[in-house]
Amino acid sequence: TQSKSTAQFFTCDAMDPASLKSCHEAVDQALGAPTVLLNAAGGNHPDAVVTPEMPFEKIPLPGWASVFDLNLVGGFLLPCQEFGPAMCGRGKGSIINIASVTSHLPLSKVIAYSASKAAVLSATRFLSREWATKGVRVNSITPGFFPAEQNRKLLFNEDGTPSDRAKAIFGHTPMGRFGDPSELAGAAVYLASEKAASFVTGSDIVVDGGFLSQTI
């Protein structure tokens, strides 16, 4: 079967309440009340990465705070505060947050990122309980390793070959490769679906090629 869909893009700053409010109003006017919120804002900061030159005890507070602001405030708190109450008022909605394998197992070097993503997973479960009786489901997706601009320097050498860190990831991933962004779509569609996932809340779907299942 074929269906006709309409897609529109709206820009906003996920760390600015006023910008989120304006975006919400624009979406309401153009497309109607949103029933799905996918919080995809997130990232890391070079001043929050442990290196030989900058050990843990030297991490500057601004670098640490910027990672938590982006991943927890912009990637969860403010968007949920803006869009969630309206969903609760209508009695239905699906909120999907982006966690990380670092939510489950902290990785070397990226301490602030790991800690902030662990907080996203915890906050997801908290909010799922708060809004369960209001018809709003709150879940998360844990992506494995997917190359993106924020991690490209860690995963690839200057000549484009996999870095030692990438090789270590492959060795710890039963499927032996990076994920493709398209492979996250199924999990998102499932969690967004009121029909398929109507009794699913407070859950985390892991899409990692088996990374978290590998020990020795």
Feature roles, as predicted:
Residues T35, G43, E57-L77, K92, ...:
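Catalytic Tyr-X3-Lys loop
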Residues L105, V189, K195-I216:
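Short C-terminal tail/terminal secondary-structure segment
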Residues C80, S116, T124:
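Active-site helix of classical SDR
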Residues S100:
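Residue(s) in the substrate-gating loop at a strand-loop-helix junction
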Residues T51-M54, T133, F145-H172, Q214-I216:
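A glycine/serine/threonine-rich, flexible loop-to-helix segment
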Residues T11-C23, L61, S182-E183:
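The beta1-alpha1 cofactor-binding region of Rossmann-like NAD(H)/NADP(H)-dependent oxidoreductases
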Residues S22-Q29, A48-K58, P62-L70:
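Active-site Tyr-X3-Lys motif and surrounding loop/helix of classical short-chain dehydrogenase/reductase
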Residues P85, R129-T133, S198:
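Alpha-helical segment proximal to the catalytic Tyr-Lys
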